[in-house]
Amino acid sequence: SSDLFTGALSFMGNFDLASYIRQASGCPVFIGNDANCATLAELWQGRLKGVENGALITLGTSVGGGLVLNGHLMSGRHFQTGQVSAMVTNFDEPTPATTVGATTSAVKMIEDVAVACKIKDTHDGWAVFEKIDEGDDRAWPIFSAFCRRVALLLINLQAVLDLDRVLLGGGISSQPSLLAEIDY
């Protein structure tokens, strides 16, 4: 299992995996969560190269985030910077079920649309986006609500951080209908 706020793998205990891999391979090793590593890659050679203040938000099973301030990936004192999945979405009922990670899962949106549209494979994102792109009455409300939650997350990040650039990542980020609906 993992820690809700840091994503730390509790079963690893105090095992220093980076040192183990470094020693075995003779190569420099950095271990971080997927969103922070993707943000580092974008900062190094991608769409965040040369950007002073930016972020990468990953949409997948949960919602990840990497934050760049003054040209550097931020980690924070408790290594929780960018943990947007832990942000509360319902102030009247602040529980794990009302966090961005629980309410804005791209995987859950895909599953919900698949069930609503009676798509046999509930993980078939291609079939789901065919329904969405067709404007299917069963798919569209679920997809639109998901995009609204992503847009609200982006608005809140921008309001607090005044970023130069925000990137979206994750498997569904290449879908034109996703960006069009968020931009709407």
Predicted features and spans:
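ATP-binding/phosphotransfer module of carbohydrate and carboxylate kinases, centering on a glycine-rich
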Residues: S2, S19-C27, A41-V51, V88-Y184
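Phosphate-binding/catalytic loop of phosphoryl-transfer enzymes
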Residues: S2-T98
